[in-house]
């Protein structure tokens, strides 16, 4: 009897209840014409279903993540700060902070307190979007524009010599002409996109005041609202938007991918994100799997079970920095292919899990670690020193910083309200030999060293160096991050 039950169970999983006649799927691109497509009506056995489902989960995780973020952020009735914390806006517009982001932020891991952030999501199949660029003068700035794959498109920022003015963001189907008064058209390969402006600000009262006028001109809106005049929003006094999840305490990043719902959303990704050259075969396998699941509840259940398993086995390990990028020396890893992932599915999903929305390598290089120089896990109950030899601070044309994150890759509030140190800090003290030592620990390293101290929570922590607009030594990897020494 047991053997009969097992056989029936297997048969339910294998049977994709579809017509037995074979059919060739329509080719997704001209290059696939004449290539045989998967046959419908085959009996997919459980291990095959699981193998393809695991690949689909790994491949599609960043795009489902992006989809869910967009649906949450664009519920805002007007541009502003959700809960007084996170910039949000209706679809086609943008919200801006007016100061550094706070420790209460859990929308995205690895925030930084060197820049003032903005955030907006766009559906460019509705119509193009205009985004404004003020005259930032000598201040570093970059607008990172991401498609649904989390690859950047367009070039907009100080590293590119972008002019102040108006820029048009267009989707793949838009066939209009560049309007008069618009500097350039920046075209995305997907219709779902988001923009994250990053505007550098010194950690001084004077610069906080000086930057406000420029921030108020960082505005985005649909093309049909464009009149050639620079619009302004007083971001500091814009009414806050209630956070619908304010009563749901969270110690980590918001869960943007729910495994049990992943394969309900995955068909939308296949529909809205066109394949890259050479990905047509992947799409064909994924679509055949979804067709089978749509006709057989047993197949669908196995997909859900596989998604739950894959979240634990495939995705969660990417939260460890050793699985993100490549070794950079002295126990650190460095980002690779950030925001221009292409076929690099490994680093795309690693970044989406651990530190989504990085900048391109020429805009920013990231160095990160969970370990000290001896290979031991960093823990905020201990104290550490990081010394940059004279002239060996990160060589940049923009700015650099060292940030401390808690076990969730977020800020843990401290009395100094200090979460990073670097270019923005005008009171860092150098050693007599010209070197610079920064300190990490739960207690002050001494009054004379306190300006160089990052207070740490008593839990596992990680350290993170940003090098914005790096010099050649940053780009080619010849610059190495310093050793992290545990202070005994």
Q: What does each model-found stretch correspond to?
A:
Residues 1-23:
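Gram-negative bacterial Sec-dependent N-terminal signal peptides
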């Amino acid at each position: 009897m047991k053997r009969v039950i097992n056989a029936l169970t297997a048969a339910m999983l294998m049977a994709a209840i579809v017509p037995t006649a074979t059919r060739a799927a329509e080719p997704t691109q001209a290059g696939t014409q004449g290539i045989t497509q998967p046959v419908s009506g085959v009996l997919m056995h459980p291990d095959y279903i699981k193998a393809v489902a695991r690949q689909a989960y790994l491949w599609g995780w960043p795009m489902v993540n992006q989809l869910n973020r967009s649906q949450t952020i664009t519920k805002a009735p007007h541009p502003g700060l959700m809960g007084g914390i996170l910039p949000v806006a209706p679809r086609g517009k943008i919200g801006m902070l007016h100061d550094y982001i706070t420790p209460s932020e859990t929308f995205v891991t690895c925030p930084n307190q060197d820049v003032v952030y903005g955030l907006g999501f766009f559906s460019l199949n509705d119509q193009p979007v205009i985004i404004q660029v003020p005259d930032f003068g000598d201040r570093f700035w970059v607008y990172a524009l991401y498609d649904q794959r989390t690859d950047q498109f367009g070039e907009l920022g100080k590293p590119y010599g972008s002019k102040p003015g108006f820029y048009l963001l267009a989707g793949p189907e838009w066939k209009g002409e560049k309007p008069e008064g618009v500097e350039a058209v920046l075209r995305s390969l997907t219709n779902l996109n988001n923009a994250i402006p990053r505007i550098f600000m010194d950690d001084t009262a004077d610069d906080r005041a000086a930057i406000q006028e420029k921030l108020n001109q960082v505005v985005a809106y649909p093309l049909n609202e464009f009149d050639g005049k620079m619009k302004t929003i007083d971001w500091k006094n814009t009414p806050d938007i209630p956070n619908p999840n304010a009563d749901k305490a969270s110690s980590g990043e918001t869960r943007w991918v729910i495994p049990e719902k992943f394969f309900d959303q995955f068909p939308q990704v296949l529909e809205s994100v066109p394949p890259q050259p050479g990905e047509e075969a992947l799409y064909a396998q994924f679509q055949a799997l979804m067709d089978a699941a749509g006709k057989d509840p047993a197949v669908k259940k196995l997909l859900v079970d596989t998604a739950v398993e894959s979240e634990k086995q495939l995705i969660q390990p990417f939260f460890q920095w050793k699985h993100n990028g490549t070794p950079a020396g002295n126990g650190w890893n460095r980002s690779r292919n950030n925001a221009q992932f292409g076929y690099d599915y490994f680093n795309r999903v690693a970044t989406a899990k651990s530190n989504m929305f990085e900048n391109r390598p020429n805009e920013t290089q990231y160095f990160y670690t969970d370990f000290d120089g001896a290979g031991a896990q960093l823990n905020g109950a201990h104290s550490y020193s990081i010394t940059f030899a004279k002239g060996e601070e990160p060589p940049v044309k923009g700015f650099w910083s060292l940030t401390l994150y808690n076990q969730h890759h977020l800020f843990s509030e401290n009395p100094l309200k200090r979460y990073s140190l670097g270019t923005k800090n005008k009171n860092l003290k150098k050693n007599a030999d010209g070197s610079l030592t920064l300190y990490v620990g739960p207690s002050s390293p001494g009054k004379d060293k306190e300006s160089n101290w990052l207070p740490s929570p008593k839990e596992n922590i990680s350290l993170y160096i940003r090098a914005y607009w790096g010099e050649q030594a940053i780009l080619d990897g010849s610059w190495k991050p310093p050793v992290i020494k545990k202070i005994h």
